[in-house]
Amino acid sequence: MKKEEGGAEMRLMMKRGKQKFIMKDYGRKSEFASFLPGIAGTLGIPIWCYYVNRGQCVVSFGVDNKDHAIMEFYPAHTAYQNVKRTGFRTFLRKNGSYMECFSKESAEQEMEIGRNSLSIQEKMEEEKLSVKVDYFILPGEKVGALVRKVTVTNEDDKEIALEILDGMPALIPYGVDSDSIKNMTQTSKAWMLPRRFRQLRAAIFPSQSWRMALC
C-alpha cells in the first residue's frame, strides 16, 4: 500500500511475515503520537515507550505508568515542541565541523514502525553521512529496558575523523513521580542531588519511598 500526502510517501510493507509501516520525510507531516506495545515475552519486564514524529521520536519511556518514568513524560502537544531538546540527541564532529542529527526537518528522513520496534534514518547529503537509530523493547530478560542502537555510516570514499556525542539530557531517579516533577520541580531536584556523598558515606532522604541507586 502506498499513499502520497504532502509530497511525502507512506507505505505498508510486508516482508517474511513482518509488517512494517514506513513513512518518508516524517518530520514534515502532521504531528502524531503513539506508544510501542511493550512486548517483553512471558519472562520479560515490559517497558512503555512514547514517541512522536519529530526529532529522534522518543519523548518518554518507563515502567508501569507515567509515575515511573525514566525520561520525563509530556502530553502530546508539549512533546511535539520538546522532543528535540529533551529527547535523545546525537551530535557529530566531522573533520572539525559540528552538526546535530535529526535537527532539520528539511533533510531526507525516514521512519519505520514495526510491531515492537521503531527505526529512523537520516541522510546528510552535504556531509556525506547517514545516521540510523533503532529502538526496541528488550524481551525475555529479568530487567526491563528500551534498547537504542545508533549507526553512523560514512558515505564518502575518503577517510574521515569523526567524533560522536549521543544520549539523553536527563533521567528521573526511582521514586520521583509525575506530580512531584510537575508541581515541586525545584524540591525534587534538591532530593535528587545528594552532595558530599562520597565524603560522608551517607545520604539523607525524606522518606523510604525516595530510593535511588548511587554509583
Feature locations, PLM:
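Anionic coordination/interaction segments
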Residues: 1-215
